[in-house]
Amino acid sequence: TTRQIAGKTIHESRFPVEENDVFIAMSDGATYAGVGHALNHGWQRENIIDFAEANYLPGNSAKYIAGNIVDECNRLYEGEPGDDTTVAAVRIRERTPVNLLMGPPADPRDATKMMTLFFSKEGKKIVCGGTTSQIAADYLHETIVTSLDYGTDPAIPPVGHMKGVDLVTEGVITMSRVVEYAKAFVEGTDLTNLWSVQTDGASQIAQLLFEYATDINFFIGKAINPAHQNPDLPITFGIKIRLVQELSEYLEKMGKQIKVSYF
């Protein structure tokens, strides 16, 4: 069907879709890419389709797919685009929850309740913090095996491994880096080229929260670690709480559904 909007003829199509279907729209700056540079006649639509299909993996986010095409356009323009180039991508996917646990509860007697609620949730499980991971290990009657490999970023403490948990990491240092990545993601100074390929704990959390998850449940303990207090914050307000609040705001701007539960 067609209709007129602001003097423009808009063509509309309605059709069934399946999971992992991808829709890509682009301005003519994409098809002009390379004119006067690498390609005499620009980057033809058929060639863009071939490029998108050749570089597609089922786990690729819509942002990654669109960014990959834009990067190739910039390469064909040799860094000097002759036209504005916009690419939009939509990927059809099921909702995928991720649950993140950080910090022991303010009242130690609430630990079992906190763990029961956390481990009853559907989806992947991330546990952050040494004390928190030990509480989780006691609840599951499992042991934590800490990796001796710092991954690709030696500034981030090593991850751990525990049966029943998808990812075990250190707390404040790791989460601070995740917030840094989230801020860059939202504000346009994107660091995806770092966290999307690195193997440290912060990068793995970023991959799960930014790319994999659609719904994120935070389970946050309000016990205060004196080593992490900031003199600019009230004594009852831990740094981890501020980190989670800031991260939640960035994740919501990414379109994620966020729920935060405090204990």
Residue ranges: model-predicted function:
Residues 29, 85, 129-132:
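Conformational gate/switch positions in structured elements
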Residues 23, 79, 124-125:
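Residue-level marker of motif borders
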Residues 6-8, 116, 127, 158:
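Residue-level signal for the start and early helices of compact helical domains
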Residues 109-140:
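Active-site beta-strand/loop microenvironment that shapes enzyme catalytic pockets
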